[in-house]
Amino acid sequence: MEKDLFMKVKCFVNQRDFSCNVFVCSDDKGAFIVDLGYYDSEIKKYLSSLPELKFVLQTHGHFDHIMGLDSFSKDFPDVPVYIHEQEVDVALNPTNNGSMGMLYSPVSLQITFKTLKEGMCRLCDYDFKVIHTPGHTKGSCMFFFKDQKILFTGDTIIETSIGRTDLPTGDEAALFRSLEKFKKISFDDDVEVCFGHGTSFSYKELMKHNSFLR
């Protein structure tokens, strides 16, 4: 019997603060989240309609991508949250996560992260590749679900542009090295590319319209 590789990706956008995308992915095996930048009753209600929620993946630790984690963890205390091993101190430090001076109340998370490294990863029957792309932050990552043809880029690549490097742990030279690394990876044209901000589109469209990747 052929394995069902269909995965539904629903995007919630934080319209109040910095328009960060929250991706809720689900299939017949369960569900997971990529970048919990906010958490409200709408997201909670949607999660309750899905199969078992397995885990949360964080592409990086900037405040606009992590602001929902503490509230979420109170409702789902047993759901682990994963982030690159070099990004833990970015997420947990209000200066490094960019919230100090940017928000009225700095983001000081009380959760405990589980860590990821570069390479293939298997979590709860989901196989994906962790692509370490430092530059926007030192532990920024992309997550590529090859079988489902979905790529999450975080803020390393955003539609027709790339992430900023003027925040703590940002490194312009490292970002451009990460872009060169990305260009050497083979993706099918119909892979859906999901950015940390903005509208998702295909890998073919990304390579056509993003001049930083030529």
Regions found by a protein language model. Give the residues of each.
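Short Pro/Gly-enriched beta-strand edge/turn motifs at strand-loop
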Residues: 3-9, 101-102, 124-126
